[in-house]
C-alpha cells in the first residue's frame, strides 16, 4: 500500500514535470528568431548587442539575434550569398555605397512596406532629411531601408602632440594647406606620423568633393539616373591628391591601409592626426591614452564657397524578402524601437554616429551631452553646414563597392610613385565608368 502510494505520487510528479516542460517548450518555440547580420565590431558590437538585449526583454514573442559577419564588404557578400541559398537573415546591415545595388536587387522588402503590413503607422519624417534622403525611393518617396549608423568623416587630433609642437591644441587645421604645415611641425617635434587616413574613396574623393562643392559624377552623383559618368578627375581633386603625395614624400602623410588601420595608429599614439568616421569615436574613446580633439574635415582654401556640406557614410538596415508575417512584424517592431528618441540618442552618444532622428538630436542637446563632450556634435554640424546642393546630398552609383576598390588601387599607385595624381584619377574614372555601364546594362 505504501509502495503504491509512492508510485502514484512519483507518477503524478513526473506527469506534472512533463506538462511544465511542454509548456516551457511551447513558450520557447513561440518566440520568433530574427537574425540581424551586421558589421559592428569592438565597442560598436557591444552597443548593438545591448540594443538587441533591451528589445528582447520588452518583447517575448520575438528575439533579435545579432550576428557579426565581418566588414561591410564581407557582410554584403554573405547576405547576397545567403539569399541565393534561401537562408538570408531577416535584417542585413549594408553600407551606404551598397544602396544602389540593394535597390536594384529583388532580394529586399522595402521597410515602408514592412511597417504597413505589420499595421504600424510609422512616421518617416522623424529622420533627419539629409540622412533619410540617401535611402529614399525617388518614385514612391518612401524609405527603402532604415538609417542606422550614419556618419561623416571628422578630423581626430592629438592635443598633447599639438602642445609639444607649439600648436594650439584647441585649433585643429581648417584647410588642407594648414594640414600640410601642421604635419611638418608635428614631425619636427618628434611624431613618427603626422597624418594618416583610410577609406580613401569615401574621404579623399567623395567627401572632399562634396565638402568643397564639387560633384563626383554627373546626374547629381547618380541620383538622377544610372547613365551617370564619373568626373572626379578635375583640377581641384587632382590638386588635392598632389598635396597628399607631396606630404607623403616628405613623410608627413603615411598610408597604412584601406580601412581602419590609421585609426588604430592614431589611438595608439603613433599618428598625430587622422580623418576617420565619426563612428570611430567609441573605439578612440576606449583606447586613446592621451588628450584628443575632434575637428571638422579640412577644406581647400582655394575652393569657392567651401566648406559646403559633408555626405553620410555608415550603413542602413535592409529587410530581406521571403520571410513570414511573424518575422516581418518583429522586424517592424525592432525598427520602431531603434527610432525611439531615447534609443537613437543613446546610440549616437555612445558610438559617435549621427543622431538619425531630429528628436534624438534635440534630446541629446537637452541632456547637455554636447557641452560635456566637446566635439561630439562635429559630424552633425558638418552634415548641416549648408543646405546640400543637388550633387552634394550623397552618392547613388551602381557597383560602388567595386568603384571604391578601383580608387584604392589607383591612389595606392600614387603613394608608391608609380603614377602621377592626374594619371591615377584619369584611370580611376575610366575603370569606374566601365563598372557603371555594366551596372546600367544589368538594370535594363
Curated annotation (Swiss-Prot):
Residues 1-30 form the signal peptide. Belongs to the bacterial solute-binding protein 1 family. Sn-glycerol 3-phosphate binds at residues 72, 96, 151, 277, 314, 353, 404. CDD domains: PBP2_UgpB. InterPro entries: Bact_solute-bd_prot1 (IPR050490), SBP (IPR006059), SBP_1_CS (IPR006061). The keyword Oxidoreductase does not apply. It comes from the Bacteria. Its main location: periplasm. GO terms for biological process: transmembrane transport. Keywords: Periplasm, Signal, Transport. It comes from Pectobacterium atrosepticum (strain SCRI 1043 / ATCC BAA-672) (Erwinia carotovora subsp. atroseptica). Pfam families: SBP_bac_8. One of its GO terms (cellular component) is cell envelope. It is found in: Periplasm. The complex is composed of two ATP-binding proteins (UgpC), two transmembrane proteins (UgpA and UgpE) and a solute-binding protein (UgpB). Part of the ABC transporter complex UgpBAEC involved in sn-glycerol-3-phosphate (G3P) import. Binds G3P. This is sn-glycerol-3-phosphate-binding periplasmic protein UgpB.
Amino acid at each position: 500500500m505504501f509502495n503504491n502510494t509512492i508510485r502514484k505520487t512519483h507518477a503524478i510528479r513526473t506527469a506534472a514535470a512533463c506538462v511544465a516542460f511542454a509548456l516551457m517548450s511551447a513558450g520557447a518555440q513561440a518566440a520568433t528568431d530574427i537574425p540581424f547580420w551586421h558589421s559592428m565590431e569592438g565597442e560598436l558590437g557591444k552597443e548593438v548587442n545591448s540594443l538587441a538585449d533591451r528589445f528582447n526583454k520588452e518583447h517575448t514573442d520575438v528575439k533579435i539575434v545579432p550576428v557579426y559577419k565581418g566588414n561591410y564588404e564581407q557582410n554584403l557578400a554573405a547576405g547576397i550569398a545567403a539569399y541565393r541559398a534561401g537562408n538570408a537573415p531577416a535584417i542585413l546591415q549594408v553600407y551606404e555605397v551598397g544602396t544602389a545595388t540593394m535597390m536594384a536587387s529583388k532580394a529586399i522588402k522595402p521597410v515602408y512596406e514592412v511597417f504597413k503590413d505589420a499595421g504600424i503607422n510609422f512616421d518617416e519624417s522623424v529622420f533627419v532629411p539629409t540622412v533619410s534622403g540617401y535611402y529614399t525611393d525617388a518614385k514612391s518617396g518612401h524609405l527603402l531601408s532604415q538609417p542606422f549608423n550614419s556618419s561623416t568623416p571628422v578630423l581626430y587630433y592629438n592635443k598633447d602632440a599639438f602642445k609639444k609642437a607649439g600648436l594650439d591644441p584647441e585649433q585643429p587645421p581648417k584647410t588642407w594647406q594648414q594640414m600640410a604645415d601642421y604635419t611638418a611641425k608635428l614631425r619636427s617635434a618628434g611624431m613618427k606620423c603626422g597624418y594618416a587616413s583610410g577609406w580613401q574613396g569615401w574621404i579623399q574623393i567623395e567627401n572632399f568633393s562634396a565638402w568643397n562643392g564639387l560633384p563626383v559624377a554627373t546626374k547629381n552623383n547618380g541620383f538622377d539616373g544610372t547613365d551617370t559618368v564619373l568626373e572626379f578627375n578635375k583640377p581641384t581633386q587632382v590638386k588635392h591628391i598632389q598635396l597628399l603625395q607631396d606630404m607623403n614624400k616628405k613623410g608627413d602623410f603615411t598610408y597604412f591601409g584601406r580601412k581602419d588601420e590609421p585609426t588604430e595608429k592614431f589611438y595608439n599614439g603613433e599618428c598625430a592626426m587622422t580623418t576617420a568616421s565619426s563612428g570611430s569615436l567609441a573605439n578612440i574613446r576606449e583606447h586613446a591614452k592621451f588628450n584628443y580633439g575632434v575637428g571638422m574635415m579640412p577644406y581647400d582654401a582655394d575652393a569657392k564657397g567651401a566648406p559646403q556640406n559633408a555626405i553620410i557614410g555608415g550603413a542602413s538596415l535592409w529587410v530581406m524578402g521571403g520571410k513570414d508575417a511573424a518575422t516581418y512584424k518583429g522586424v517592424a517592431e525592432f525598427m520602431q524601437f531603434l527610432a525611439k528618441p531615447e534609443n537613437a540618442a543613446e546610440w549616437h552618444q555612445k558610438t559617435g554616429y549621427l543622431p538619425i532622428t531630429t528628436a534624438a538630436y534635440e534630446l541629446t542637446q537637452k541632456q547637455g551631452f554636447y557641452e560635456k563632450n566637446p566635439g561630439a556634435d562635429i559630424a552633425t554640424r558638418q552634415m548641416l553646414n549648408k543646405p546640400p546642393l543637388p550633387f552634394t546630398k550623397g552618392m547613388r552609383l551602381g557597383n560602388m563597392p567595386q568603384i571604391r576598390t578601383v580608387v584604392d588601387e589607383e591612389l595606392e599607385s600614387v603613394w608608391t610613385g608609380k603614377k602621377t595624381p592626374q594619371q591615377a584619377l584619369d584611370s580611376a574614372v575610366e575603370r569606374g565608368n566601365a563598372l557603371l555601364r555594366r551596372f546600367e546594362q544589368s538594370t535594363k
